[in-house]
């Protein structure tokens, strides 16, 4: 690949740092999960950075940004590349700033953690749970592979949003430390109203180098699957449980048939094609309340609970069937699947879902996540599965 003089000069100035020379590694680090969208796949698949550099601390981040600014080289921030909107793609080549070495938990105590952006979500929990008995309030379904910086910079909510709402809501981020890209980079700290300027900004207006986030008490969550052949009953199951004041949940997902049978390999032997599925994570001290609620709703079937089951093979973590993992599992079976992102607000969320079902019968497969909305009421985030045909039809 022929590189511009600007890129060559920037690479030379940064050669004492961890600069990657292998093209396969550069190409890999240049990509996020944009390929979830067939529209983005055709537009972004060819994009690749000119070089990749991995800073080990904030001082090196400042040096990289200063050098790239001086040489007019574009910078794209990389956590783990699991975002699926194409928001972290090197549109103009340039430098990918990979934060994998900045992966330390700096401090944790009950209720809060201070952490570097390259720390994996699972590693934040792995550190905090034994150290202070608390865990992240919410995380993406890519908990095992995504970074905390990428989640805050590119995510909006996820597992835990049924209780805590979205990341943008007051109290779900405490503080962000950011380095700007300019002739003399500045180190800025954002709190309160200012947080919205840099959270969910994809690293486009500054590089997050430190995060302070709230934690919640950690539990050995019980992972459960419930089925019903009646769509309204399945949808209402997640809705009602999310509104039960005494039952603590981490996730409440609803999957319209035939999702479980067609796309969830380890669940498929235990469901019929007509079964709608509800995925739940229930706090252990809430199980008695949950089972009492189920007994009042005898038409719902508890087919799996992680603490007491006879399945030949564990289905794994229930949240790895929810949020964007639903689409990922469907894509493994049918590469033409994509999804639509919809928000169904309280109090009309169930009616609006059914209007959508009625408007596109047989064309859309509903996938809902119960979330606490801005007003504290429970509604649904929709990640509706759809088979891609044409861009016109998708629009």
Please provide the spans of the model-predicted regions.
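Short, well-ordered beta-strand elements within core beta-sheets of diverse protein domains
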Residues: 51-56, 222-227, 279
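FAD-binding subdomain of flavoenzyme oxidoreductases
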Residues: 106, 121-122, 126-246, 252
